Amino acid sequence: PAVANEQHYEVPAEFFRIALGPHRKYSCAWWPEGVTNLGDAETMALSATCERAQLADGQHILELGCGWGSLTLWMAARYPNSRITAVSNSHSQRTWIETEAVRRRHSNVRVVTADMNHFDTDDRYDRVVSVEMFEHMRNWHALFGRIRQWLVPDGRFFMHVFCHRSVPYSFIDRGHDDWMSRHFFSGGMMPSDDLPIRFQ
């Protein structure tokens, strides 16, 4: 986590204002036919996540790996009676989200700075949502077990990861031309499509 933080999670927020779209979505956007700009593609992806996670106003929601708060702030605005706890391993991301939540007058957001390898809580949630965070994790079985404990009996877990159709692999720096492993995703993993099923 320390190398990934240095590479991009603790980069100043101003950089991401320039590099990302208006929601500062630090994960996949969705470009269906007719979508022609990044802001709309971010909106499409955020809407799809909420729909697929079956979010509803009044739920207690835990977001694992909240990035720059695109989903956190989106949920806070659309589900004002929900309580949203967002977890990030980045102090600068936490500061940005908390500042934006105050500016937008969202009183239903709490941000926790923690390494997901060690995060735990006694709270119980209706929904646990994770978008492109599990690619940093290694012990999925243990984390799935903790998530199960965090859910109320009829709660649901929604996980979005990028994946390879058949082969999981680690991003290991193998030389000067290995840009992704060296400069952007050191220690990360490309899961295979079926990997989550193997840890149920």
Task: Kindly label every feature range from the protein language model.
Residues 141-156:
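A short glycine-rich, Lys/Arg-flanked "PGG" loop and its adjoining helix->strand segment in the class I
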Residues 163, 169-200:
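Substrate-binding/catalytic lobe of Class I Rossmann-like enzymes that use SAM or dcSAM, i.e.
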Residues 104-116:
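Conserved SAM-binding strand-loop segment of SAM-dependent methyltransferases
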Residues 83-88:
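Conserved SAM-binding motif I beta-strand of class I
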Residues 117-128:
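A short acidic, Gly/Pro-enriched loop at the edge of an enzyme's catalytic core
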Residues 58-67:
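Conserved class I S-adenosyl-L-methionine
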Residues 68-80:
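Conserved SAM-binding loop of SAM-dependent methyltransferases across substrates and taxa
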Residues 1-52, 56:
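Conserved Class I S-adenosyl-L-methionine-dependent methyltransferase catalytic core
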